[in-house]
């Protein structure tokens, strides 16, 4: 007998799904979303001076805890369907997202050097396998992604 995923509706466009075997949570679209669509705005619930696995980096020493909190369940993918615009504080669809599809973003698009590196399990054709932050990736890979203004500034200073 297969145990069903637990789902929690969190907005007009998304729900959190919890895997019954691992307990991991992810955010999924409950409606179709189009490229360029602002799917949510966000704010800083708290500003931390160090990264942790729940923060989004906006400056060298500013890592924000997201508000609304359920945005923390937007997981990583090397083939993301949304970007975090940390300047406008908006999450924007970058390709069509079908109802039921997991909402994902590319963590190095906002993170310079992550608190915890991890092995990526996204299974995309372009999977990078180990995710550590933009500082650990070659420019030719990063140019394939839409990056936050902060990460782009870091790269500009590096070159």
Q: Residue locations for each model-derived region?
A:
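Conserved catalytic SET/PR domain of SAM-dependent protein methyltransferases, capturing the structural core
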Residues: 1-159
